[in-house]
């Protein structure tokens, strides 16, 4: 899949799950299951409930995503 096929949305982390998975509530009210991207994992950036994040969604599965940015 090409990178320009992704949908970028903002949301808030509501819950942390095992294996670096998070429940994220998007701005439109939907809840998705998101994992951490490799760059965030590599730089040891902590993501906690309540953090505002940017999530990339695949057009093929809108219930799962990848967290690509955590706002300060």
From Swiss-Prot:
It holds the Pfam family eIF-1a. One of its GO terms (molecular function) is rRNA binding. Residues 1-72 form the S1-like domain. The modification Phosphotyrosine is found at residue 60. Keywords: Cytoplasm, Initiation factor, Phosphoprotein, Protein biosynthesis, RNA-binding, rRNA-binding. Its main location: cytoplasm. InterPro entries: NA-bd_OB-fold, RNA-binding_domain_S1_IF1, S1_domain, TIF_IF1. Gene3D superfamilies: Nucleic acid-binding proteins. It is found in: Cytoplasm. One of its GO terms (cellular component) is cytosol. Disulfide bonds: none annotated. CDD domains: S1_IF1. One of the essential components for the initiation of protein synthesis. Stabilizes the binding of IF-2 and IF-3 on the 30S subunit to which N-formylmethionyl-tRNA(fMet) subsequently binds. Helps modulate mRNA selection, yielding the 30S pre-initiation complex (PIC). Upon addition of the 50S ribosomal subunit IF-1, IF-2 and IF-3 are released leaving the mature 70S translation initiation complex. Component of the 30S ribosomal translation pre-initiation complex which assembles on the 30S ribosome in the order IF-2 and IF-3, IF-1 and N-formylmethionyl-tRNA(fMet); mRNA recruitment can occur at any time during PIC assembly. Belongs to the IF-1 family. This is Translation initiation factor IF-1. It comes from Oceanobacillus iheyensis (strain DSM 14371 / CIP 107618 / JCM 11309 / KCTC 3954 / HTE831). The lineage of its organism: Bacteria, Bacillati, Bacillota, Bacilli, Bacillales.
